[in-house]
Amino acid sequence: MLSALIQNGMSKSGDPTDVENNTTNGSSSTTDNANDVGRGVNTENNSKLENDSSNAATITTSKQDPSAVDEATTPRSINTGASTVPEPDNTRRDSVSSNVSTATTESRRRSKVSRACDQCRKKKIKCDFIEGHDINPDQSCTGCRKIGEKCSFERIPLKRGPSKGYTRSNSQSRERRGSQRRRSSSEVSQKGKKPSVSNPVNAVNESKSEVDASLHPGQSATSTTNVSLHPLLQYLPGMNHSAVSASSPSALQQPFWKVPYHEYQNQRRPSLDSLASDSSQKPGGKTNQQQPLPSQSQPQSLQNIGNSRSNTGPLPTQDTFRNQRYYYQPSQDSVSEAGSDNRRGSSAIPPLLNPAIQLQQQQYSYSQFAIAQQQQQQQQQQQQQQLQLQQHLQQQHQLQQQQSLHSPQANTMNASTGISNGGFVPYSGNKGLPSGGHVLERTDSVASDAMSLNASPNIYTAEVESAPASPVQKKRKRSNRSSTSKKGKSTQQNLPATTPTLINYGQIADAQLIDTYYAYIHLRFPIIPINKDTLTNDLLLVNTQPISELHELNNYILLWFRNSLELLIRICLKDKESEEILYQQSTFVSAINECFQKIVDIHPRFRDLETQIDEKIATIYLVTFIILNCTLALVSYNNSFVLGMSVIIFNELKLWKNFIFGNWNTVTGHDKICLRLYFELNTFDSLQSCSFGVPKLMNLKLDETTASKLFYDEVSNDGTGQETDKWNVDEDPERIRIIVDNMELGYFLSRLCQARRSSFEKPLPLVGEHNENKTIPGLFRAFLSIKRQFTDTLLDLPDAEGKLPEMTPELVTRLSNMICDLTTTIHDLLKLNVEVNPTNCLELFPDNSMQTVDESSAHNSAAQSSDPSNIEVGTVSPYVIAIYKDLFNVVELIKNMPTSLIGCVMGTQAPNFDSQPLVLQLSQCMNNMLQITTFTSSLSPFKIFKHELNAQSKNKTIDAVPLWKQKMKSSLAPLQTAITPQEIMMAQFIDIAWCIADTEELGWFNQ
């Protein structure tokens, strides 16, 4: 019934013959309009199946002549408005429209519906639901009829088709987009040459309008004032919204540049470290959109060159520093950053070239001919600027001296930064600061880095406040505030490893840094291989006034020496993990990379001025590399780049020649310090090779007496040898003995790397008796020697054919003695580590308040004089984590061997063999194993990088084949099949020896 009515209605509205028969008094114009209406209805019904048939006819008719509305819609309203045909539901509009469209051609029903019911869709079967009470009285399909339910269409269908705003132009290739960006940037760069581009734009718009008119005849051009413009078009002169009113059809789609741009699309947003090398930024904090072309920027270029310093000229004053680039100043109205004026954050690498040369390099591709004409004028103006700057600096220097004499507060401020007018202040006058020590903020130039230690805080704050800020910098400041917490410290999520972080240097005063180092670090590893008095009263007394490039370099080296030393101290602090931002891995790596990069970047200049640089500065420069390598060893972080670059720089200074040709008895004091530093770098190289299995980078000519020759010096108690005592590594003979003992461990590690089985060059040196080495370095040397003997004995048990020997009383006694000696050494070594410092950290501020220099010095001297055996208590060492890891590996492998040996001893039958002493000895060994487990749980030397101790024991089980054994399998005979219990036990011991050999060849941290 429904199909007949619909067919009748559609035939009356769609067939022009029916319309003409039903209309008796219609004119020819009315008939033509009716024909147009019929054709419009058919077209609309076939193209838009989602609309209702009555609505489609009404909408289509309204677009044409109004006179034909009544005649065209009357038959359709009669058919669709009959009482027998129900009003179609909105949710089923798609089904009705589908039936209406198919009924226009023939009266057959579609073979499938446009949408399956919920039950059929859930079962994934075909649905034959037909809408209509006459055709389908129970309103259910075949599947639902079988289970006695009605079809339901409650599920909301998912959206189909492409996402909103998708255009084919947005998916074009990257090469095409890159070419468009380059063309856009080149067009933007020509704005200084073209007075106006409005006429070409209007011509383009007119041509586009003609194309649109030809494509859409009879339609008026629609307004496109709401369409967003491309960011590059906003910077073209004469380009506005009305000028681009008619664009291409793709521009009418949803634009993908929803966020307004403030910089060109072909430019990236610079980070803190990329500002110095980003060509999109210019001095004064202005972007390229405000920088004119070279033909128009001659006065500005000269001004910038005049304001910048030369390689040999003086440092700019505070007025000229306001014109320097890339001030990263905080917001003045931010409460959380009220004290950020005293914060020195990470900056970009200081340029090693003259800023004038850098400016020429940046402009060379655009103004290579104009610069040749400007050179003479630039030189003249630069000389005038230098004379004015020198006069201004002299006046400012005199004013600072007068203020420092009359103002004790200014003296305290200058002492806190470590440099007072003439250079680093003497240690006696360097007082500590409160816990929130003064920190300065740096800019991105060498001059500003040098200035940060010389200028007074008030002057530098005024410069920061008056520095210009570009829109890009303001954006970065807002993002910086959002990425930091209320305390001004960033969280781990906001500190990626690739982005430099803001490290607040200056939290510990300079006097406290030096005092803490000599009290807790210098004793077990002399990173600064000179005594305290010589360092503070001689080496650090360097002229750092910004008069020439040489003084500027001195100031820069002192700055990063101090920052590196503070980084080392802060890593060693105890109970600071919850507060110290450096305990985050990404922040620590960024801080290490920043310090190392800063000190490496000045090496070309250091090498050029090597003959003019003072020996004191050269020593401090080399000490900075040792500090950074020691920091990495304290956390056991494998960074071969830092070590490799350090070795390269040391080798460029030809320090290795003194180990071959030099006479150590006649070397000067500074040369001896350099030899000590070179020896310490070799120690870190050996430690990293043993820990991670990497190849050794240095191969020095060393022997057993090298450490004592370099570090042991006689101390004169009567004061007659004051000149010779000046270059001693320490002032106390007992402390010198401990230092030499630790340096001998470094030599032993170097020999251990050379004595590997893979490249056997030299045997291990002999180790003294066990009772004579009750120190941590001595016990560890004994442990390494016994471990090598133990593994060699077990690996040599099989003969050339792979047969295992019999378990004789001599072999049982030998193995029992070696396992007992090894266990006793491990027990004593772990016990001593627990007594000295179980966490390998120092507690600098026990009451959350900084101690003064005099109080800490008096406390240390009293402790040393009252109980010399407790000198090492509370000190830290870079060896501890490596020692702990190697001990843990061996304990996990041999912990069951004493029990097996007791059973073997009890089962050995020999006429003259007394098993009772061996059983007692092995029982004591088992007792030591229990205490070793307790000591292992008490030690926690790991910081920042939490190494999994059980990872190696999981891989080095008895069932797994050791890696080194697999490599040596071709040169070894296969072992015979173990049958007896003694043979099975011996085969297990041999596998344990192979696992221990893995750690020696591939590193203690090998996993």
Curated annotation (Swiss-Prot):
It is found in: Nucleus; Cytoplasm. Belongs to the EDS1/RGT1 family. SUPFAM superfamilies: Zn2/Cys6 DNA-binding domain. InterPro entries: Carb_Metab_Trans_Reg, Zn2-C6_fun-type_DNA-bd_sf, Zn2Cys6_DnaBD. Residues 473-489 have a biased composition (Basic residues). Its main location: nucleus. Residues 21-33, 289-303 have a biased composition (Low complexity). Residues 1-115, 155-224, 267-350, 399-423, 462-496 are annotated as: Disordered. GO terms for cellular component: cytoplasm; nucleus. Glucose-responsive transcription factor that regulates expression of several glucose transporter (HXT) genes in response to glucose. In the absence of glucose, it functions as a transcriptional repressor, whereas high concentrations of glucose cause it to function as a transcriptional activator. In cells growing on low levels of glucose, has a neutral role, neither repressing nor activating transcription. This is Glucose transport transcription regulator RGT1. It comes from Kluyveromyces lactis (strain ATCC 8585 / CBS 2359 / DSM 70799 / NBRC 1267 / NRRL Y-1140 / WM37) (Yeast). Residues 1-11, 42-65, 74-83, 96-105, 196-206, 274-288, 304-323, 329-339, 404-419 have a biased composition (Polar residues).
